[in-house]
Amino acid sequence: MPKYYCDYCDKYLTHDSPSVRKSHTVGKQHKLAVQLFYQQFEAEFTQSLIEARLKEYEESKGRLIHQPPMGIIPTPYGQMYQQQQQQQQQQGILPFQGMQPPPHQQQGMVLSPGMPIHKMQPHQFNNNNNPHQQHSFQPPHHQHHPHQQHQQHQQHQHQHQHQQQHNQPTIPGL
């Protein structure tokens, strides 16, 4: 009679029958061996993924030097401005206080062709420091604050209950 070999436990069973295999697979040693096998498999698989990612990173490290982020294409205007700034700094020329960088240019950020240029204005704040001053913005009339809606609903229910109490027919003798 052929013997059954358990790959997880690395041993042969006495003989190959369903009852022997079943009693072996429900045993404590077999369950522990199966758990250990899958833990090792998971660890090896995770390590191989980590090594593959590191290899990809090391290979791409030399290719990605000084590339702008996706969607931002360097333009000649931005490059000329940066070169001009570098030359002025090297010559010791300080830019005039009123000089500003081109619109939307912040620390190497360059607009791609076709991007709209908007001059952003600083937010205007009210300087009179009156905390009780009403703001000019009012929400549309059809929108109500949730608390107001709750109050209106309660008032409606109260009116409805009041009407029901007064509209009940009176029974003589009660």
From Swiss-Prot:
Residues 141-163 have a biased composition (Basic residues). GO terms for molecular function: mRNA binding; pre-mRNA 5'-splice site binding; U1 snRNA binding; zinc ion binding. Its main location: nucleus. Keywords: Metal-binding, Nucleus, Ribonucleoprotein, RNA-binding, Zinc, Zinc-finger. Residues 82-109, 122-140, 164-174 have a biased composition (Low complexity). SMART domains: ZnF_U1. GO terms for biological process: mRNA 5'-splice site recognition; spliceosomal snRNP assembly. One of its GO terms (cellular component) is commitment complex. Component of the spliceosomal U1 snRNP, which is essential for recognition of the pre-mRNA 5' splice-site and the subsequent assembly of the spliceosome. SNRPC/U1-C is directly involved in initial 5' splice-site recognition for both constitutive and regulated alternative splicing. The interaction with the 5' splice-site seems to precede base-pairing between the pre-mRNA and the U1 snRNA. Stimulates commitment or early (E) complex formation by stabilizing the base pairing of the 5' end of the U1 snRNA and the 5' splice-site region. Component of the U1 snRNP. The U1 snRNP is composed of the U1 snRNA and the 7 core Sm proteins SNRPB, SNRPD1, SNRPD2, SNRPD3, SNRPE, SNRPF and SNRPG that assemble in a heptameric protein ring on the Sm site of the small nuclear RNA to form the core snRNP, and at least 3 U1 snRNP-specific proteins SNRNP70/U1-70K, SNRPA/U1-A and SNRPC/U1-C. SNRPC/U1-C interacts with U1 snRNA and the 5' splice-site region of the pre-mRNA. Belongs to the U1 small nuclear ribonucleoprotein C family. This is U1 small nuclear ribonucleoprotein C. It comes from Dictyostelium discoideum (Social amoeba). The gene is snrpC.
